[in-house]
Amino acid sequence: SGGFDFSFLPQPPQEKAVGLGPGPMGLMGPRGPPGASGAPGPQGFQGPAGEPGEPGQTGPAGARGPAGPPGKAGGVVGPQGARGFPGTPGLPGFKGIRGHNGLDGLKGEPGAPGENGTPGQTGARGLPGERGRVGAPGPAGRGSDGSVGPVGPAGPIGSAGPPGFPGAPGPKGELGPVGNTGPAGPAGPRGEQGLPGVSGPVGPPGNPGANGLTGAKGAAGLPGVAGAPGLPGPRGIPGPVGASGATGARGLVGEPGPAGSKGESGGKGEPGSAGPQGPPGSSGEEGKRGPNGEGSTGPTGPPGLRGGPGSRGLPGADGRAGVIGLAGARGASGPAGVRGPSGDTGRPGEPGLMGARGLPGSPGNVGPAGKEGPVGLPGIDGRPGPIGPAGARGEAGNIGFPGPKGPAGDPGKGNRGAPGPDGNNGAQGPPGLQGVQGGKGEQGPAGPPGFQGLPGPAGTTGEAGKPGERGPGEFGLPGPAGPRGERGPPGESGAVGPSGAIGSRGPSGPPGPDGNKGEPGVVGAPGTAGPAGSGGLPGERGAAGIPGGKGEKGETGLRGEVGTTGRDGARGAPGAVGAPGPAGATGDRGEAGAAGPAGPAGPRGSPGERGEVGPAGPNGFAGPAGAAGQPGAKGERGTKGPKGENGIVGPTGPVGSAGPAGPNGPAGPAGSRGDGGPPGVTGFPGAAGRTGPPGPSGITGPPGPPGAAGKEGLRGPRGDQGPVGRGETGAGGPPGFTGEKGPSGEPGTAGPPGTAGPQGLLGAPGILGLPGSRGERGLPGVAGAVGEPGPLGISGPPGARGGKHGNRGEPGPVGSVGPVGALGPRGPSGPQGIRGDKGEPGEKGPRGLPGLKGHNGLQGLPGLAGQHGDQGSPGPVGPAGPRGPAGPSGPPGKDGRTGHPGAVGPAGIRGSQGSQGPSGPAGPPGPPGPPGASGGGYDFGYEGDFYRA
């Protein structure tokens, strides 16, 4: 009933009873006082193993005990070390001459087993073992009189005690026996193609084989791989600058008309369409990163609620204008893009406020006279009279239509006019059409190495280790498995490993928000245009100036209608071919493309003559660098040293070669997230990784069409002669009919023996005649010609049965042997007989000489690609491997497509007004606008040139 049997324990000695019968049972007296505690009894025998009790509740977590001493290195042989990084591929050797096919060598004996590798490093500390079982109950106590007290009821299960202190590390385990050799692992990845071997010596010429039959012509080979695209040719020499066009005749100034009344202000016009996009400007150099600030990083607070957008602050005071940088030398002009179609002309905007009248500039030099214009129409008054005195200057008339643009004059040297008031910002026009992408710029020098990136997020929790071996219980009996203990605190951070190689450049960060628009600069008075100078030689590119603040983004205007596409201009003459440029760096080899579907077999062509062996081709591209190997074994945790003082920041030294990857230390506690650093410089694209393991085999596709018959190979050696069959004798055919005997012919000359006629049926035996007397031997007559067999006669009726045969006569003399007759024609084949029993195998003949190795057959067309198998479940995330060395710099990639415009960020702090940059080059003249309404503005002009405000 769940109790224990203590009958095996020693019982107290019983006093000998008197031989009387049992008396009556007395009344039970009152319970006496408890006796004094007796001396502790001797140690009882170990009781039987108790039944396992119910698992106790998990007690509160005890205080963290002191760190135990580091465990001793275990003697278990560690796993096989990770595969080392692949060495740099050697230069491919020269292609050797193809030697004759040698004889197959004998199979070699298997090599001796390799030596055991060095034992691996100590593995990580295992999880604590299972909880021991409840021990057996102790011996029963004894009273003062030595009697065994009654066994009390089972007490309630006590609460679990506090967790015990970690035990001392166990003794060093002994080195276990050498395990059995494991099964052969899966085939490793295909090794890299070795260098071609040295050509072997030319073997002796073989025996000339028999001329084989001419084989059928093989199918046409697959088309070769397309060669790599050639290097881009050098840039052509720019052509000469075209001559300036002829200057048109200057229009006649009409007489000034009366001043009209000032009209009402027109409504705000719709924004005009944007002009064609200008060529892209040169990229500025990236600024240097400032020094890191001091101070320790505080703990990361909880993320606050996102506040609403604050009110826009007052614009700050304008900062001091920065120093204008030196004007950079003009870079090389990029190829001119194709001019986009002209958009529809937008309505003119509202006229701005008229600025203060500027001081008149000094008159410029007189430009060269243009060609004489056409003769105007004769005036109403006939021939002009003599010139009278100059009258008073009349009012300015309306501005006539603009005449053709004359050549630019020299720039005026007058003082700069006073700045006019700021005009209102016009509405922003619609975005212009995207210009043609400019030519690819030259690759700049490699930038400085980027700063070390922020530490990545903590990896996923690794799988729990296997439980340790069950330890001995207190009383030698293993207890039941207790609940799994809580995960221990993370260990201390290991010693910092050596700095890894510089990582690849990270992706460019998103563009920051646009700053506030600076105040517009003072608009100067328009100077007179000078003559166009000859195009100078392009100067060297100077350092980029300090970029000015970016203005606020205006409201998006209405998009104008798309204009009609203009006709393409005439194609210019091709420029002179420049000298070839230096060869570019060798790019990485691209991945092999997927095999295309098998095409139909082409027609069989005529065999061409074998060409001469060409020269050895250039060396191929170097293969891609292999992927990083498996992570190394975990190193032992070093002691944490004291933090040193911050030293003086020295100059940046040269980038050293990548050192060996150190072992990964134990995972430290997750630190607080630091402030976001500036986006790192985009690194160079890394080398293509090694091809992954082959995926599961797809479903076998339908068989492809049969390929063309390959060329017939050389005739192989003759095989051993098979056993000779012994057929059974076929059944005899039916006997033929007996022909009639023809008349005896005259003996003629001996002709060739004729073909034997069919055997006739045996006639009925004739009447037995009497034996005649033996005649004399006559002379042999001349053999007559064998007559043709006559037609088969009708078989006569069977004759009467004759008597018995007479006595056999004596044999006649043997005649002379006649001449051998000619071989008659082959008779018809008889019916096939029954197959005879298999004969005994004959003796094995001698082995024939090995035949020459046949040519390799043409490679069959690739079969249809099988269906793609289902994607397997993702495996567990492995530990991060060591950072591999930086791969070689790949070729510059093609310019990517223009990304979608990002969302407009919040308005930044208004920047200080930048200094006025140098004047940009004059843009192309825009299309003439429609004539505006005649307003009542102020008219002023100089030397007959009128301007209307």
From Swiss-Prot:
Protein localization: Secreted; Secreted, Extracellular space; Secreted, Extracellular space, Extracellular matrix
Glycosylation sites: 95
UniProt tissue specificity: Expressed in bones.
Biased composition (Gly residues): 263-272, 292-313, 435-444, 530-539, 671-680, 722-736
Keywords from the UniProt entry: Extinct organism protein, Extracellular matrix, Glycoprotein, Hydroxylation, Secreted
In-chain residues carrying the UniProt-annotated modification 5-hydroxylysine: 95
Note: These protein fragments were extracted from an ancient mandible bone collected in Haiti.
Subunit structure: Trimers of one alpha 2(I) and two alpha 1(I) chains. Interacts (via C-terminus) with TMEM131 (via PapD-L domain); the interaction is direct and is involved in assembly and TRAPPIII ER-to-Golgi transport complex-dependent secretion of collagen.
Protein name: Collagen alpha-2(I) chain
